[in-house]
């Protein structure tokens, strides 16, 4: 899959050096503008007015319980400024104390101008999953948790998830093991299930290049790394065809799992930039 640019691997706690850098170096800590390690696991990037915003899980060394989602910004994808803990642990509910919050994804809704955040919320034993919904009027502001994302009036009780925003402005929720849902015009609920990709694994991430849709996914090895693979389709509804691995066999996706593909604008072209997270070493 020659279109995929491997440029950014996000560690459990990843970040840039305090001095200005001009090169992304994978596999080592990065540091933000305050000299602190960039802490943004399971992340995504949103471009806004020529600036890049990185959203991820703010991890603690003491517990896997959700402490918040972080936001950093950069004008070069190398030097990062800490912006905010954009969503903190809630007093109660799906992201309350002793809950898990993972795989945060943010999109700007073209109809409303609102920023929509989706995430996997769960209990500490991963037996009470939800797809959660939070919103904000500004990209790096304080997001308000609205509750579970609903489909036909019911919560989506799934775990590994991703999002995709098509060039026509439509937003999609991607779910492990194959479901692809189109969001409503305001991105606050699910409108329809538009595809179900047979043979998919976990950690779904989608992009489009030259009119072809690509879906990346990982094998099922719990916390351990594996060789991720991909599917393609002429339209998001399918038919979807399994194509094989997108990294050399045995490299275990360079010790990462797909989390997001950022459409990086380079002159007149847009290059898919792979983002992977690490769960084990």
Walk through the language-model features, giving the residues of each.
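Bacterial Sec-dependent N-terminal signal peptides
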Residues: 1-20
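Carbohydrate-active catalytic/glycan-binding domains of CAZyme proteins
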Residues: 19-281
């Amino acid at each position: 899959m020659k279109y995929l640019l491997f440029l950014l691997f996000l560690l459990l706690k990843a970040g840039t050096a305090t001095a200005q850098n001009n090169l992304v170096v994978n596999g080592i800590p990065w540091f933000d503008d305050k000299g602190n390690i960039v802490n943004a696991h399971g992340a995504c990037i949103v471009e806004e007015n020529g600036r890049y915003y990185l959203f991820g899980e703010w991890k603690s060394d003491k517990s896997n319980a959700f402490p918040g989602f972080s936001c950093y910004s950069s004008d070069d994808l190398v030097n990062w400024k800490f912006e905010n803990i954009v969503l903190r642990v809630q007093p109660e509910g799906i992201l309350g104390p002793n809950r898990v919050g993972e795989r945060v994804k943010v999109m700007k809704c073209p109809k409303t101008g609102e920023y929509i955040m989706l995430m996997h919320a769960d209990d500490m034993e991963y037996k009470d999953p939800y797809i959660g919904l939070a919103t904000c009027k500004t990209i790096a502001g304080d997001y308000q948790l609205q509750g579970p994302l609903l489909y036909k009036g019911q919560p989506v009780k799934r775990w590994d998830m991703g999002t995709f925003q098509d060039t026509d402005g439509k937003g999609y929720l991607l779910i492990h093991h194959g479901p692809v849902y189109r969001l409503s015009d305001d991105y606050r609920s699910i409108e329809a299930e538009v595809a179900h990709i047979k043979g998919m694994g976990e950690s779904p991430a989608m992009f489009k290049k030259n009119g072809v849709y690509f879906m990346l996914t990982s094998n099922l090895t719990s916390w351990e790394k594996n060789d991720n693979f991909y599917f393609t389709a002429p339209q998001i509804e399918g038919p979807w065809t399994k194509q094989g691995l997108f990294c050399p066999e045995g490299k275990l996706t360079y010790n990462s799992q797909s989390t997001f593909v950022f459409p990086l604008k380079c002159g007149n072209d847009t290059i898919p930039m792979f983002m992977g997270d690490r769960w084990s070493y």
